[in-house]
């Protein structure tokens, strides 16, 4: 099973970050997984690729497509009591189970700030949902040929190219990265990364 979830949070201890808090949020979610299944969390920690992704805090009432200013992205400030949304994706059914079962009222400590989990959305609201891999594949294969694909990045995103990081979201890098994640998770239906990269390189 694959899932896209959104945590509705309330800021317990406000303040600001001096840089993008991605690693802090990653650590907070890992602690939630460890609380649910310590043995699985240890095994997960040893993996090269982690089967989940974490988005960025979005203030309630703000459109998901709103463009963030650089300061708001890199040095965000959150007030006590402020409501936020945090988007997660799970590419592993054990991770999905752990995230869906985060107890309401759990405090996510991310650096000097902390946030209380008030609701977990996975029912279609905020473009969330859970789907079986086979169902996703069937839907993709039965869909009409896409004429246009739009990808929006709402948090700092880089792609590994040889020994360097590339911040330019070229189609070949985007879809090759997705192919890697699919393969590393040993999801059904083989994906040939070289073919994916070749086709994606033709996109403009």
PLM regions: where:
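RNA-interacting cores
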Residues: 1-204
């Amino acid at each position: 099973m694959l899932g896209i979830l959104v945590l509705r949070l309330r800021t317990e201890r406000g303040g600001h970050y001096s840089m993008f808090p991605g690693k802090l949020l990653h650590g907070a979610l890992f602690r939630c997984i460890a609380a649910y299944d310590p043995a699985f969390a240890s095994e997960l920690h040893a993996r090269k690729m982690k089967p989940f992704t974490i988005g960025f805090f979005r203030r309630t009432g703000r459109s998901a497509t709103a463009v963030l200013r650089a300061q708001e992205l890199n040095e965000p400030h959150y007030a006590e009591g402020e409501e936020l949304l945090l988007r997660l994706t799970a590419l592993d059914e054990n991770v999905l189970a752990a995230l869906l079962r985060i107890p309401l009222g759990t405090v996510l400590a991310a650096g000097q700030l902390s946030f209380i989990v008030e609701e977990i959305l996975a029912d279609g609201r905020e473009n969330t949902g859970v789907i079986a891999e086979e169902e996703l594949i069937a839907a993709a294969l039965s869909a009409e040929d896409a004429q246009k694909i739009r990808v929006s990045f709402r948090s700092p995103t880089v792609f590994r190219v040889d020994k360097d990081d590339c911040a330019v979201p070229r189609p070949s890098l985007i879809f090759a990265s997705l192919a890697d994640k699919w393969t590393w998770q040993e999801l059904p239906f083989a994906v040939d990364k070289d073919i994916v990269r070749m086709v994606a390189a033709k996109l403009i």
